[in-house]
């Protein structure tokens, strides 16, 4: 367990010093939010503004799938880690680093959303809960996409484009939650996550385990 915490700490440092994931997500999310407010009417903002911003956030997060293993693969640290800790812990560390960074980025922009979109505190809580569920699934899929690209090394950049369709059900649920403040839909999102998360972790672990043919 201690080794997992050490790996998560290392990944948080790597992803935010090298890839600047928190800074990038906050800036991109703010840009999408402010652009939405400036170019749309108040009615359209209330209907579609937040959903559009969430979609943009997920697109920006998917972009990290090609780099999450890049530095580890280039400097040989991935091979070293595989000889020291289990491949499952490496995948979990990647997942938690991306998920924690994404959550921090989301928390930073919540006050801006509260002001610009004129939402109540309850609506902000529903919004955070639903997007948080999406971030759980998207973080695992980003790791899976990164694992595929790391394993094949070439001509695998297209893999990231397959992530977005898997997130569509949760995006639809988020829209319904924001429209009706229906807490029960969050439990459906949890169920969707419970279906995809084990599959994503299993496939990612298998790919990383066999990348150097290490057993």
From Swiss-Prot:
Protein name: Uncharacterized protein RC0356
Keyword terms, alphabetized: Cell membrane, Membrane, Transmembrane, Transmembrane helix
GO BP field: cytochrome complex assembly
Spans traversing the lipid bilayer: 21-40, 50-69, 95-117, 122-144, 156-178, 183-205
A Pfam family matched in the record: CcmB
Record flagged with keyword tRNA processing: no
One annotated GO molecular function: heme transmembrane transporter activity
Keyword set includes Transmembrane: yes
Subcellular location: Cell membrane
Membrane topology value: Multi-pass membrane protein
Entry GO terms, CC: plasma membrane
Source lineage: Bacteria, Pseudomonadati, Pseudomonadota, Alphaproteobacteria, Rickettsiales
InterPro entries reported for this sequence: Cyt_c_biogenesis_CcmB (IPR003544)
Organism: Rickettsia conorii (strain ATCC VR-613 / Malish 7)
Similarity comment: Belongs to the CcmB/CycW/HelB family.
């Amino acid at each position: 367990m201690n080794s997992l915490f050490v790996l998560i700490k290392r990944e948080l440092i790597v992803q935010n010093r090298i890839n600047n994931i928190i800074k990038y997500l906050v800036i991109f999310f703010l840009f999408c939010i402010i652009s939405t407010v400036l170019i749309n009417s108040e009615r359209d903002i209330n209907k579609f503004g937040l959903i559009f911003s969430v979609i943009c956030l997920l697109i920006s997060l998917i972009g990290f799938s090609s780099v999450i293993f890049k530095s580890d693969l280039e400097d040989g640290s991935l091979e070293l880690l595989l000889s020291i800790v289990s491949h499952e812990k490496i995948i979990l560390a990647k997942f938690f680093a991306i998920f924690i960074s994404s959550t921090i980025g989301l928390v930073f922009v919540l006050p801006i959303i509260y002001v610009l979109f004129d939402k109540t505190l309850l609506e902000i809580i529903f919004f955070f809960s639903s997007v948080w569920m999406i971030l759980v699934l998207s973080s695992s899929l980003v790791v899976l996409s990164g694992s595929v690209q790391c394993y094949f090394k070439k001509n695998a950049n297209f893999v990231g484009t397959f992530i977005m369709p898997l997130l569509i059900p949760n995006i639809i649920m988020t829209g319904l939650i924001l429209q009706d403040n229906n807490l029960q839909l969050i439990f459906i999102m949890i169920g969707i996550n419970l279906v995809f998360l084990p599959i994503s972790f299993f496939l990612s672990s298998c790919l990383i385990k066999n990348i150097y043919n290490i057993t």
